[in-house]
């Protein structure tokens, strides 16, 4: 009887130790995010913005990876893009061109604080130079990209980074390709930022 109790205790301790070990997908995701951090892509796990289709193809549902590249001495327009058919398309809820074709009405949620005196804030139309631009990202990243945001001196890409490391969604995953794929992503973010400055 004492041996039986000893075996149960040992199995319980071993089971507890096995439960503490992170699974393979979590380890891969950690490696991806640490590499992105080293490349100054500033990864974060955020709730899906309400203008992006997230979990179950519903707007604002689920969690996404947010990778932000901060560019020194750069001023980018405040724009949002969604991926439609492998191309960047401006977020239709962000644009209101119904009043005037050359002016853009900024929704009240993103008006600056200095516009408190003016109730109908109107600015020049935002630069949509990335409209219909192809993604041109690695095949292991491109299917998981959801949106792009530019503001001030940063360009942010939203994508399902966990799908990149999950064997069911990316069977061609190889750990040695993480850095190369992220370097291509960083280069594309820099290219898109320079196109928006023209």
List each language-model region with its residue ranges.
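N-terminal signal-anchor transmembrane alpha helix of single-pass membrane proteins
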Residues: 1-39
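Short alpha-helix boundary/capping motifs
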Residues: 3, 7, 53, 60, ...
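Structured extramembrane domains adjacent to transmembrane segments
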Residues: 60-191, 195
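Intrinsically disordered, low-complexity boundary segments flanking structured domains
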Residues: 27-32, 52-55, 134-135, 141-146
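Short extracytoplasmic
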Residues: 41-58
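Hydrophobic transmembrane signal anchors and adjacent membrane-proximal interface regions, especially
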Residues: 16-18, 50, 104
